[in-house]
Amino acid sequence: MKKCWSVLTDDMGSCYITHLGVAHIHHVFNGSRKKASEERGFLVPLHPTLHTYGPDSVHMKPNQGLDLRLKQECQRYYEEHYGTREEFIKEFGRSYL
C-alpha cells in the first residue's frame, strides 16, 4: 500500500474536520483527476459520515458545502505552491474560486 500524504494535514489517521480517529481517505478531485490528487497531495482524511454516508457528505453533495470548501483550499494551495490559476484549470478542469 502506498503512503498517502496531504497538503492540508499531517495527520492522515484522524478526520480533518472532526479530528476523530476513524477516517476514510478522500481524493479531493476524483474520477480522471484522482491520480493528480495523489501526486499533488490533494487527499484528506474524513470521518465516514462526512465522506460517503451522511446526507451532507462530500460524495452526496459534490461541488457544494464541504466538498467545495476542500476543492477551494486545494486550489489556493496549488496557486501558492505549484502554478497559476490557468495551469490549475488545465490540470483540474475548472476553477473553484
Show which residues each predicted segment covers:
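Short, charged surface segments at domain edges that flank catalytic/cofactor-binding sites
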Residues: M1-S14, K34-G41
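Amphipathic alpha-helical interface surfaces
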Residues: H24, F42-L46, C74
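Short recognition patches in nucleic-acid-associated and regulatory proteins
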Residues: V22-K34
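Short functional micro-motifs and their immediate structural scaffolds
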Residues: L20-H24, T52-P55
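Short Cys/His-centered divalent metal-binding micro-motifs
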Residues: L43-R69
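Short flanking/linker segments adjacent to small metal-binding domains or redox-active Cys/His motifs
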Residues: K71-L97
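Short cysteine-rich clusters marking metal-coordination/redox-active sites
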Residues: S14-T18, H47
